[in-house]
Amino acid sequence: MNIIKANVAAPDARVAITIARFNQFINDSLLDGAVDALTRIGQVKDDNITVVWVPGAYELPLATEALAKSGKYDAVVALGTVIRGGTAHFEYVAGGASNGLASVAQGSGVPVAFGVLTTESIEQAIERAGTKAGNKGAEAALTALEMINVLKAIKA
């Protein structure tokens, strides 16, 4: 039986991060966690990380697709926060972002890590951006690096 596994060290990786400006006070913590994980754990060089800001989570798939198709990046990490409100807007934005990002990964062959928080409250979002529940930005960055290495191992 052949088993393919990979680690997260990828010192030569070129990684883009797309990040939503809406809910920036939370997303800044996700970005800090992602960059820290990429550089400290993944050993990615600072010069190999590109950050692209977009207005909101709904715009993440389009920017992510442009980056994935550019041929310049080995992976894209998408970061944002969608907090449920009193209308159906949450479902449209969260669903559009999730489905769109999955479509980009499947269509481009470039790993797209989902670091978009979809929470019931601001408190839950803050917990997932570096307090009680860890930092989902860091987790997404490590997922991207592992997938870069998994795909390399599959192609080897």
Swiss-Prot record:
<dbReference type="GO" id="GO:0009349">
    <property type="term" value="C:riboflavin synthase complex"/>
</dbReference>
<feature type="binding site">
    <location>
        <begin position="81"/>
        <end position="83"/>
    </location>
    <ligand>
        <name>5-amino-6-(D-ribitylamino)uracil</name>
    </ligand>
</feature>
<protein>
    <recommendedName>
        <fullName>6,7-dimethyl-8-ribityllumazine synthase</fullName>
        <ecNumber>2.5.1.78</ecNumber>
    </recommendedName>
</protein>
<dbReference type="InterPro" id="IPR034964">
    <property type="entry name" value="LS"/>
</dbReference>
<feature type="active site" description="Proton donor">
    <location>
        <position position="89"/>
    </location>
</feature>
<feature type="binding site">
    <location>
        <position position="114"/>
    </location>
    <ligand>
        <name>5-amino-6-(D-ribitylamino)uracil</name>
    </ligand>
</feature>
<comment type="similarity">
    <text>Belongs to the DMRL synthase family.</text>
</comment>
<feature type="binding site">
    <location>
        <begin position="57"/>
        <end position="59"/>
    </location>
    <ligand>
        <name>5-amino-6-(D-ribitylamino)uracil</name>
    </ligand>
</feature>
<dbReference type="GO" id="GO:0009231">
    <property type="term" value="P:riboflavin biosynthetic process"/>
</dbReference>
<feature type="binding site">
    <location>
        <begin position="86"/>
        <end position="87"/>
    </location>
    <ligand>
        <name>(2S)-2-hydroxy-3-oxobutyl phosphate</name>
    </ligand>
</feature>
<dbReference type="GO" id="GO:0000906">
    <property type="term" value="F:6,7-dimethyl-8-ribityllumazine synthase activity"/>
</dbReference>
<dbReference type="Pfam" id="PF00885">
    <property type="entry name" value="DMRL_synthase"/>
</dbReference>
<feature type="binding site">
    <location>
        <position position="128"/>
    </location>
    <ligand>
        <name>(2S)-2-hydroxy-3-oxobutyl phosphate</name>
    </ligand>
</feature>
<dbReference type="InterPro" id="IPR036467">
    <property type="entry name" value="LS/RS_sf"/>
</dbReference>
<feature type="binding site">
    <location>
        <position position="22"/>
    </location>
    <ligand>
        <name>5-amino-6-(D-ribitylamino)uracil</name>
    </ligand>
</feature>
<dbReference type="InterPro" id="IPR002180">
    <property type="entry name" value="LS/RS"/>
</dbReference>
<dbReference type="GO" id="GO:0005829">
    <property type="term" value="C:cytosol"/>
</dbReference>
<keyword id="KW-0808">Transferase</keyword>
<comment type="function">
    <text>Catalyzes the formation of 6,7-dimethyl-8-ribityllumazine by condensation of 5-amino-6-(D-ribitylamino)uracil with 3,4-dihydroxy-2-butanone 4-phosphate. This is the penultimate step in the biosynthesis of riboflavin.</text>
</comment>
<comment type="subunit">
    <text>Forms an icosahedral capsid composed of 60 subunits, arranged as a dodecamer of pentamers.</text>
</comment>
<comment type="pathway">
    <text>Cofactor biosynthesis; riboflavin biosynthesis; riboflavin from 2-hydroxy-3-oxobutyl phosphate and 5-amino-6-(D-ribitylamino)uracil: step 1/2.</text>
</comment>
<keyword id="KW-0686">Riboflavin biosynthesis</keyword>
